[in-house]
């Protein structure tokens, strides 16, 4: 119930108008429910900390929207959407999207539509005391807003990267209500909501109907969804922390000053993971374009070896998280491949063999009950010295006699071993060593350790790293600093053309790559 919703310490409500943007109804792992609720209710931190802005534009759809503003607006007028300088990859992506948008929505003289000068907003004023102490509720939409000359027809075109799963019913219902009842402009007779994918130009109709049908859709799906947004209580540390105005008062985000071994107080707040670090080391532009979520090439992203590795991880995660923890055995189902993965017969057979090898080193032999196991948990720490939110997702955290153990699992098709130092080969283990050595995972330090499990056709290797051994900690700290230092001071993310371009999943958007067409 809304009565039990409470803000954290350190915030002040500055408005009695509740404003909800339609995107909040989508939810998902990249949104924080508690932050959305605070934002809708008009809360601000009591002592806001000035933040430095990024030099480059980081809103992936912003330049596309700005280009559409120029295309549809009066000559010489600046676009409504303001953007910063563009990275080469974002410019290429945006130009690609505009070209496909014009092809998907050609001008129709028989049914002319014009862009409205101001997006619609639905306003509602409670007739009596409001449980959330609001004088007014507002729902807003974002996208390309078009209407017929007489205003009887409204259409909202929602730009997305690709057409994925359908958005939640509550999202579509809220948008339909704004189109049907929002101002400015006369009430329409019909409304339409359509998604447009910048990647391939495909469109998908989410709703089309009369004004009354739109209102009925909201009555069916909207109120519960709205309450879910307004009364969100879950703090969800993760990638959203990078731009969160409530980070300094968040009760769920743990701080880890000095974790990365660098210090700078004049840099934009950012997020970082070992995956980002690897991508940046290969090519700064590659990491930046991945962070922008530019579409990747399936021929690279879902290459069969990588796909087999992800399928094995998904199988083990489900097995380890299911019910009472029981050690895995050599009995592997013939149809072991989880839903969503497509492997050829020889890869399925190899995967089954590797899973049987896992039984000999399954960590569930050491746990007491389900509370001792965390499969792919989200480990998030704010390094306040660097102002970087560090993100990690170990394959498994398990408790051995009260001590937390960080387990990473890898696969190999050969029995050859590398001579390269372990913490350099697998930087996620370096992060694990530093976190455990600092006591950030809690628990009894006596048996706390990091483990690397490598599944091979001939058997399983299990490497154990003592995080409290001085040499291991020094090496781990050095590995992290080396991965982070240059990236932390970089504002341009210049491409670094070379052999890695051949296996770059975002090469299509990079004009510096000589293999961009092949990667597409």
Language-model features: where?
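Metal-dependent nuclease catalytic regions and adjoining charged, substrate-binding loops involved
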Residues: 2-9, 14, 161-170, 176-263, ...
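Well-ordered, non-membrane alpha-helical segments in soluble/globular domains
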Residues: 171-176, 219, 349-355, 430
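Active-site catalytic microenvironments for nucleophilic, acid-base chemistry
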Residues: 178-182, 294-295, 315-322, 434-439
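Phosphate/pyrophosphate-recognition segments in soluble nucleotide-handling domains
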Residues: 216-302, 335-339, 359-380
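Hydrophobic multi-pass inner-membrane translocation pores used for secretion
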Residues: 254-256, 266, 274, 280-295, ...
């Amino acid at each position: 119930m809304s009565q039990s919703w409470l803000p954290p310490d350190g915030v002040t409500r500055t408005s009695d108008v509740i404003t909800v943007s339609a995107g909040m109804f989508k939810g998902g792992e990249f949104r924080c429910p508690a932050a959305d609720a605070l934002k809708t209710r008009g809360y601000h931190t009591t002592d806001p900390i000035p933040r430095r802005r990024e030099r480059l534009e980081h809103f992936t759809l912003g330049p596309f929207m700005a280009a559409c503003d120029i295309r549809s607006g009066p000559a010489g007028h600046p676009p409504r959407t303001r953007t910063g300088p563009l990275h080469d990859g974002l410019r290429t992506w945006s130009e690609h999207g505009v070209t496909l948008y014009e092809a998907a929505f050609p001008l129709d003289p028989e049914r002319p539509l014009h862009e409205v000068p101001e997006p619609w907003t639905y306003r509602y004023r409670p007739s009596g005391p409001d449980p959330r102490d609001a004088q007014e509720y507002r729902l807003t939409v974002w996208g390309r807003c078009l209407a017929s000359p007489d205003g009887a027809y409204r259409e909202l075109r929602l730009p997305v990267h690709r057409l994925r799963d359908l958005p939640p019913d509550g999202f579509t219902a809220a948008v339909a209500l704004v189109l049907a009842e929002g101002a400015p402009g006369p009430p329409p007779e019909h409304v339409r909501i359509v998604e447009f994918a910048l990647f391939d130009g495909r469109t998908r109709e989410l709703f089309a109907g009369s004004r009354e049908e739109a209102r009925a859709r909201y009555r069916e799906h909207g109120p519960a969804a709205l309450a879910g947004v307004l009364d969100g209580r879950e703090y969800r540390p993760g990638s959203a922390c990078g731009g969160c105005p409530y980070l300094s008062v968040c009760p769920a985000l743990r701080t880890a000053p000095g974790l990365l071994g660098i210090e700078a107080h004049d840099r934009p707040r950012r997020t970082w993971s070992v995956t980002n670090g690897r991508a940046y080391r290969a090519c700064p532009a590659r990491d930046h374009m991945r962070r922008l979520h530019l579409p990747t090439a399936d021929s690279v992203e879902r290459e069969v070896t990588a796909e087999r590795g992800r399928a094995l991880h998904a199988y083990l995660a489900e097995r380890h998280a299911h019910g009472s923890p029981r050690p895995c055995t050599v009995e592997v189902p013939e149809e072991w491949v989880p839903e969503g993965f497509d492997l050829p017969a020889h890869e399925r057979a190899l995967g089954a063999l590797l899973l049987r090898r896992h039984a000999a080193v399954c960590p569930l032999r050491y746990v007491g009950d389900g509370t001792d196991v965390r499969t792919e948990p989200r480990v998030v720490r704010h390094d306040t010295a660097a102002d970087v939110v560090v993100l990690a997702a170990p394959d498994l955290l398990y408790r051995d006699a009260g001590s937390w153990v960080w387990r990473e699992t890898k696969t190999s098709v050969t029995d050859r071993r590398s001579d390269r130092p372990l913490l350099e080969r697998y930087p996620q283990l370096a992060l694990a060593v530093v976190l455990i050595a600092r006591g950030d995972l809690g628990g009894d330090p006596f048996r706390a350790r990091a483990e690397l499990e490598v599944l091979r056709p001939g058997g399983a290797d299990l490497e154990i790293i003592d995080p409290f051994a001085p040499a291991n900690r020094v090496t781990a700290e050095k590995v992290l600093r080396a991965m982070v230092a240059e990236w932390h001071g970089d504002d341009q993310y210049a491409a670094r053309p070379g052999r890695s371009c051949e296996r770059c999943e975002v090469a299509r958007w990079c004009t510096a790559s000589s293999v961009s067409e092949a990667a597409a």
